[in-house]
Amino acid sequence: MRFIYACDIHGDTNKYERLFQKAKEENIEYIVLGGDLLPKRGIRVIIQPEFIKGFLNEYFKKLNDNNIKCILIPGNDDLEKLDIQINELCNRYTNIYNIDNKRVDIENVSFIGLSKVLDHPFGSKNRVLVEENLKMQPQLSEDIYINKDTAIITIEEWEKYRQTNVDKMEDILSNLPKADKEKKTIYVFHNPPYGVGLDVCANGLQVGSKAIMKFLEDSNSYMSLHGHIHESTRISGLWYNELGKTICIQPGQTELGEGKCYYVIIDTELNKQYRYEM
């Protein structure tokens, strides 16, 4: 199986188009998108539903017309309350698979996805989790948005709220669909694991999940695909590493409007992966 993997497109239509053209040029049947599909600029409650209904619908149709399948998860910047709309769109097409908290078996591969991320400094607490011994980072916004971005609380209220009202990464991972032992398992987790160079912020802070790190170490899975920290590859110099027998990949991404798009082409038969920019 050969596929293109990219993440953190954030509604950049030029990047979407480049990935489509690359799949056509290379005769690749699959595109895997690792979260943060929708625009994050402006008023997201208005822009993101319009993007799903308009561009994303037409994009999925174009992929279908060209016999290209797309496997995807949302990310923390994609409003959780729009999951119903995303699922309805994906269900219109037989070539589109939303694997958030689900498993899909394609050819000799089982894909299992998770959109959730650890609590971060940003005010929009969309899809965030905590884990054992995770300290709250200094917050960049005085207003904290919870309950799918509809309720606003203070930083002090959030500090108390997250202690009892936010799920733990360990629990979410333990309840994921089980892998098919007869197939190669690829996890698509928006949050990268801790400590293997795929989670490094511009300030050098490692913000990956220790629970995901342990999960992958114990899983004996074939591969895991990540995103979330756009600049990590630039800061650490690493876009892949290994945890036990699991190959972990984080291609990184440029910001909206910047010229380049980072992606990886993966061949599960030849056990090879190559990172590109275009």
Predicted regions and their residues:
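Extreme N-terminal starter segment of soluble prokaryotic enzymes
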Residues: 1-4
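Acidic/histidine-rich helix-loop elements
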Residues: 7, 38-51, 121, 125-131
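Active-site environment of divalent metal-dependent phosphoester hydrolases
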Residues: 10-14, 38-42, 72-84, 103-105, ...
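Core catalytic region of metal-dependent phosphoesterases/phosphodiesterases
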Residues: 13-106, 251
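Proline-aspartate-enriched helix->loop->beta-strand connector
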Residues: 28-32, 212, 216, 220-226
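Active-site-proximal segments of metal-dependent phosphoesterases and phosphodiesterases across multiple
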Residues: 38, 42-53, 179-220
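Binuclear metal-dependent phosphoesterase catalytic core
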Residues: 104-107, 210-218, 232-278
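Active-site-proximal loop/helix segment associated with metal-binding centers of metalloenzymes
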Residues: 109-202
